[in-house]
């Protein structure tokens, strides 16, 4: 369970650390527009768009902003963004995956490479670390939506792979192939999830000391602060004391 908790806390630092709401909303809007462009502008029929809208709602992004981002795609937004995945190693040899949406591939690559180098790590080729992660669906519900037993029973019946329940809520994991069906089944029973997305989940995590952990968090913060970066994933664990310190 500790691994699940660490993974969740590390991945969620982005929201807590990003004090610049306008920058966060800009990133969320970019993902909504791209998702709507690539598929239908109806979230009910477009899983990626639905995930983007849920993420925006979770950050209290105004409804008007969400609708405007979707209309941008419908109206043939002139901005074109490339989806790029960067992979590399951070301090302590920790594997890191960076997902970006950029209108300037050269700038993004140069900036991200610089972040890795300054941290003492190095940016690798595509595929250099992704084999250590699984492409996994995650669905989250608030703790008061159901008891741990009820959520577990419903998730297993729907075809989920794993469920982790705590005071913070319920995390349901499903394969990329079954994710959409599991999400639909749970929504029919418990209502709309607070999050439903496909992520890179580490197969195993590496425990690092506090000094290395601080360097890794600094790298992740620098990456997350970049306008083009949408998501950052890594396969490390830190002490509870450091997690509390960095979250404070």
Swiss-Prot record:
Gene3D superfamilies, alphabetized: 1.10.10.200, 3.30.70.980
Record GO biological process: regulation of DNA-templated transcription
GO MF assignments: DNA binding
Source taxon at top rank: Bacteria
Pfam families, A to Z: TACO1_YebC_N, Transcrip_reg
Subcellular locations according to the entry: Cytoplasm
Record carries keyword Transcription regulation: yes
Keywords: Cytoplasm, DNA-binding, Transcription, Transcription regulation
Gene Ontology CC terms, in alphabetical order: cytosol
InterPro entries xref list: Integrase-like_N, TACO1_YebC-like_2nd/3rd_dom, TACO1_YebC_N, Transcrip_reg_TACO1-like, Transcrip_reg_TACO1-like_dom3, YebC-like
Region (Disordered) location: 1-21
Family: Belongs to the TACO1 family.
Protein name: Probable transcriptional regulatory protein Rpal_1287
Native species: Rhodopseudomonas palustris (strain TIE-1)
């Amino acid at each position: 369970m500790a691994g699940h908790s660490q993974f969740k806390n590390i991945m969620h630092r982005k929201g807590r650390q990003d004090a610049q709401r306008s920058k966060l909303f800009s990133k969320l809007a970019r993902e909504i527009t791209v998702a709507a462009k690539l598929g239908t502008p109806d979230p009910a029929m477009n899983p990626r768009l639905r995930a983007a809208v849920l993420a925006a709602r979770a950050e209290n992004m105004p409804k008007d902003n969400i609708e405007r981002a979707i209309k941008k795609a419908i109206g043939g937004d002139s901005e074109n963004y490339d989806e790029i995945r960067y992979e590399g190693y951070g301090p302590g040899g920790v594997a890191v995956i960076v997902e970006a949406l950029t209108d300037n591939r050269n700038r993004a690559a140069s900036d991200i490479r610089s972040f890795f180098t300054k941290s003492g790590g190095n940016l690798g080729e595509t595929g250099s670390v992704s084999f250590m992660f699984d492409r996994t669906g995650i669905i989250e519900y608030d703790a008061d939506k159901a008891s741990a037993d009820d959520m577990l029973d419903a998730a297993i019946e729907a075809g989920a792979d794993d469920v982790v329940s705590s005071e913070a809520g319920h995390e349901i994991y499903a394969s990329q192939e079954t994710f959409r069906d599991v999400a639909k089944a749970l929504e029919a029973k418990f209502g709309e999830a607070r999050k439903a997305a496909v992520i890179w989940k580490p197969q195993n995590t590496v425990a690092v000391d506090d000094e290395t952990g601080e360097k890794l968090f600094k790298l992740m913060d620098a990456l997350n602060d970049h306008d083009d970066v949408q998501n950052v994933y890594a396969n490390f664990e830190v002490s509870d004391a450091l997690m509390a310190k960095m979250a404070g």
